[in-house]
């Protein structure tokens, strides 16, 4: 075979190869030998073959021949198919891992009605009864009795069985007082905690919870409140959260239906009396726990020292939740409903408190602001006049005059004779020389006093008239000790006889 007729790369740059020349010379033999053709016109087929061959060889100008084929297209398709298969495999692997982690970490709260052998495959009542039976086996007598007591209370008083919506009077109280309308009210029968200043709670040595008097409103998007742990021994368990009414207050919040709480151990409880789920860091003295509620979505979340934790409750839209704090030992917790700043900055900026700090009720008027009031002005003037008159009377007289009380009987004239005892009125005038002027002066200078005040008032000054023995000096009337003794009766009679005879002798 000649070089120019050899098949290979040289055939592309030179003359047509042997295969090409043979096809060109005898195209019909090539077609008949290769594949059987259907019964068609032979001339048309021959023309088509010649046209194809001419198109392949007409552009040979000494360079590379532009051969059109499907080699590049098939390579691109192969690469595309490989990439798509790789992405598909990765997607399937990601989906498998997502399903695995979903079933592993979110088993609580799911209800399966099929028989796949996982916990929670029954409905709520059956699952709760099974968990209750398992927990009662490991409880001690005290815990079992407390649980049965709480269970009896819940059965007799189902959650939300009482009217807890904010009434008109409560709404008006909130409008007047603001956030000060909320306060904790301990149960009198339990009496294991003491509330001071509406929001400062002190617990004692047994398990107890305390609720507020008003529920959390539902008008705004978010409501938020905080509780600060002031005193907490290590052995005390504190539970801070939300409950509905009625609730067994001898149990902690979160242990029974429609209640949720953040425990001081770092766990959370939501309608769960048997086991707690890990939630956040443990609480110590000085920590601040916040509770937030979104009424529109029914979501409840917690914060710790100003840092938001994950949501705990979803879909609780219809319940009326009450802020609740409980403990099983001595501790002190102070609650902030919005009367001061929050530790959680977002709640502080967006004003998520239960109500405004100040209500519409005006404070009492300050001292000295009665100048514009006629009633207060008249009362002030009358009081000033009375005090001035009393002061002047006290200065003009050494004693305060107390007028006698008026008799409830008919009014008597001054000339009527009364059988009532007359009060002794000392006089500065002579006895028997009475006059109206003297009586008037005596009345003006005399005070009618109560019997209890007679011992405290000194007697009035008194001087006897001239010539009266009552006014003479007592010491002058006393006999002189140095004078001779008093003569006897006989001597006195003899002296009297001598005195009677002496005038006769003179005559």
Curated annotation (Swiss-Prot):
Residue stretches of biased makeup (Low complexity): 401-414
UniProt-listed InterPro entries: B30.2/SPRY (IPR001870), B30.2/SPRY_sf (IPR043136), ConA-like_dom_sf (IPR013320), SPRY_dom (IPR003877), SPRY_Ssh4-like (IPR035780), Ubq-SigPath_Reg (IPR050618)
A Pfam entry, by short name: SPRY
Parts of the chain that traverse the membrane: 83-103
Keyword rRNA-binding tagged: no
Cytoplasmic-facing ranges: 1-82
Main location: membrane
Role according to the record: Components of the endosome-vacuole trafficking pathway that regulates nutrient transport. May be involved in processes which determine whether plasma membrane proteins are degraded or routed to the plasma membrane.
Annotated spans, Disordered: 385-417, 449-507
Keyword set, alphabetical order: Endosome, Glycoprotein, Membrane, Protein transport, Signal-anchor, Transmembrane, Transmembrane helix, Transport, Vacuole
Domain of life according to the entry: Eukaryota
SMART domains named in the record: SPRY
Family of the protein in this entry: Belongs to the SSH4 family.
Keyword Phosphoprotein: no
Organism: Aspergillus fumigatus (strain ATCC MYA-4609 / CBS 101355 / FGSC A1100 / Af293) (Neosartorya fumigata)
Name assigned to this protein: Protein ssh4
Lineage of producing organism: Eukaryota, Fungi, Dikarya, Ascomycota, Pezizomycotina
GO CC annotation, single: vacuolar membrane
GO BP, sorted A to Z: protein transport to vacuole involved in ubiquitin-dependent protein catabolic process via the multivesicular body sorting pathway
Biased composition (Polar residues): 385-400
PANTHER family: RAN BINDING PROTEIN 9-RELATED
Glycosylation sites: 480
Cell location: Vacuole membrane; Endosome membrane
């Amino acid at each position: 075979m000649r070089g120019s007729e050899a098949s290979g790369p040289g055939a592309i740059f030179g003359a047509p190869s042997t295969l090409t020349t043979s096809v060109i010379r005898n195209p019909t033999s090539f077609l008949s030998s290769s594949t059987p053709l259907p019964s068609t016109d032979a001339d048309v087929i021959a023309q088509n073959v010649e046209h194809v061959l001419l198109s392949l060889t007409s552009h040979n100008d000494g360079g590379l021949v532009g051969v059109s084929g499907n080699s590049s297209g098939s390579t691109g398709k192969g690469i595309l198919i490989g990439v798509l298969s790789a992405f598909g495999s990765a997607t399937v692997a990601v989906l498998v891992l997502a399903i695995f982690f979903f079933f592993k970490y979110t088993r609580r709260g799911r209800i399966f009605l099929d028989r796949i052998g996982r916990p929670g495959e029954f409905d709520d009542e059956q699952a709760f009864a099974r968990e209750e039976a398992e927990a009662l086996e490991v409880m001690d007598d005290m815990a079992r009795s407390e649980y049965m007591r709480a269970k009896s209370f819940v059965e007799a008083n189902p959650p939300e069985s009482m009217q807890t919506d904010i009434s008109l009077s409560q709404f008006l109280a909130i409008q007047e007082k603001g956030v000060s309308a909320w306060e904790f009210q301990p149960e009198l029968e339990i009496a294991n905690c003491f509330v001071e200043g509406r929001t400062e709670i002190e617990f004692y040595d047994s398990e107890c919870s305390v609720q507020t008097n008003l529920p959390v409103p539902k008008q705004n998007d978010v409501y938020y409140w905080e509780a600060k742990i002031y005193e907490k021994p290590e052995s005390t368990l504190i539970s801070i959260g939300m409950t509905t009414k009625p609730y067994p207050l001898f149990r902690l919040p979160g242990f029974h239906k429609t209640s949720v709480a953040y425990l001081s151990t770092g766990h959370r409880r939501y309608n769960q009396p048997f086991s707690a789920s890990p939630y956040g860091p443990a609480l110590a003295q000085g920590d601040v726990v916040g509770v937030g509620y979104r009424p529109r979505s029914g979501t409840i979340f917690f914060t710790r020292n100003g840092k938001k934790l994950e949501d705990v409750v979803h879909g609780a839209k219809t319940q009326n939740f009450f802020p609740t704090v409980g403990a099983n030992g001595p501790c002190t917790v102070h609650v902030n409903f919005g009367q001061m700043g929050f530790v959680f900055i977002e709640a502080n900026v967006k004003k998520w408190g239960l109500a405004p700090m100040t209500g519409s009720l005006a404070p009492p008027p300050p001292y000295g602001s009665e100048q514009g009031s006629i009633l207060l002005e008249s009362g002030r003037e009358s009081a000033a006049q009375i005090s001035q008159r009393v002061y002047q009377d006290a200065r003009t007289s050494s004693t305060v005059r107390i007028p006698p009380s008026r008799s409830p009987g008919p009014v008597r004239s001054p000339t009527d004779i009364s059988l009532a005892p007359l009060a002794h009125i000392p006089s500065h005038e002579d006895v028997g020389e009475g006059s109206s002027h003297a009586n008037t002066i005596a009345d003006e200078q005399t005070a009618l006093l109560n019997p209890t005040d007679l011992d405290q008032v000194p007697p009035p000054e008194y001087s006897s008239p001239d010539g009266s023995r009552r006014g003479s000096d007592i010491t002058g009337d006393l006999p002189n000790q140095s004078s001779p003794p008093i003569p006897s009766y006989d001597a006195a009679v003899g002296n009297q006889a001598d005195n009677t005879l002496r005038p006769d002798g003179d005559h």
